[in-house]
From Swiss-Prot:
This is YcgL domain-containing protein Shal_1837. InterPro entries: YcgL-like_sf, YcgL_dom. PROSITE patterns: YCGL (PS51648). Residues 1-85 form the YcgL domain.
Amino acid sequence: MICAVYKSRRKAESYLFVEKRNDFERVPEALMDMFGEPQLVMMLPIEKRDHLGFADIKKVRSELKEKGFYLQLPPPVVNLLEQHKKEIGFNPD
């Protein structure tokens, strides 16, 4: 299976994988509104891959077959200062 990978112009580091190039029929309208106009990044032979960046390749394959698309969002931003404060037990109160 070769899937098409698109990036969002509205949401940084957000990618939409679809089964066929320019085929967004199975992608919910609300998701497309949030995602914005998709920009093609690459065509990807997904069956030949055993890993895929930040995404779980098995989940990508499964969702493409079941839903017709897979949405990859960026990992949450970690506030390193707040994390460090918690680790050392800092409490400003």
